[in-house]
Swiss-Prot record:
NCBIfam families hit by this protein: PRK05610.1, uS17_bact
Native organism: Synechococcus sp. (strain RCC307)
Coiled coil: none
Family in the record: Belongs to the universal ribosomal protein uS17 family.
Entry keyword annotation includes Ribonucleoprotein: yes
Function: One of the primary rRNA binding proteins, it binds specifically to the 5'-end of 16S ribosomal RNA.
Assembly with partners or alone: Part of the 30S ribosomal subunit.
Keywords: Ribonucleoprotein, Ribosomal protein, RNA-binding, rRNA-binding
Protein name as it appears in the record: Small ribosomal subunit protein uS17
GO terms classed as biological process: translation
Gene Ontology CC terms, in alphabetical order: cytosolic small ribosomal subunit
């Protein structure tokens, strides 16, 4: 089975070793064909507390780590400061 990956933006880093990542999914409406965007918020494991609000990150699915945490940060693609 393939590993699921998503790319999103960190919207909250107030928890210890956990960040909230918003992933935008864009798709055409089945009847009207207008592009619709839906945002899903994932609680993601961040072992070293490296992520900050505004960072663009790649997340991967993992084993359940808590009641609501099933994803882990794979890499920080861009930081809020722009590097």
């Amino acid at each position: 089975m393939a590993v699921k990956e998503r790319v999103g933006t960190v919207v909250s880093d107030k928890m210890e070793k956990t960040v909230v990542v918003a992933v935008e999914n864009r798709f055409p409406h089945p009847i009207y064909k207008k592009t619709v965007s839906r945002t899903t918020r994932y609680k993601v494991h961040d072992e070293d507390n490296r992520c900050q609000v505004g960072d663009r990150v790649r997340i991967t699915e993992t084993r359940p780590l808590s009641r609501s945490k099933r994803w882990a940060v794979a890499e920080i693609m861009t930081t809020k400061s722009g590097s």
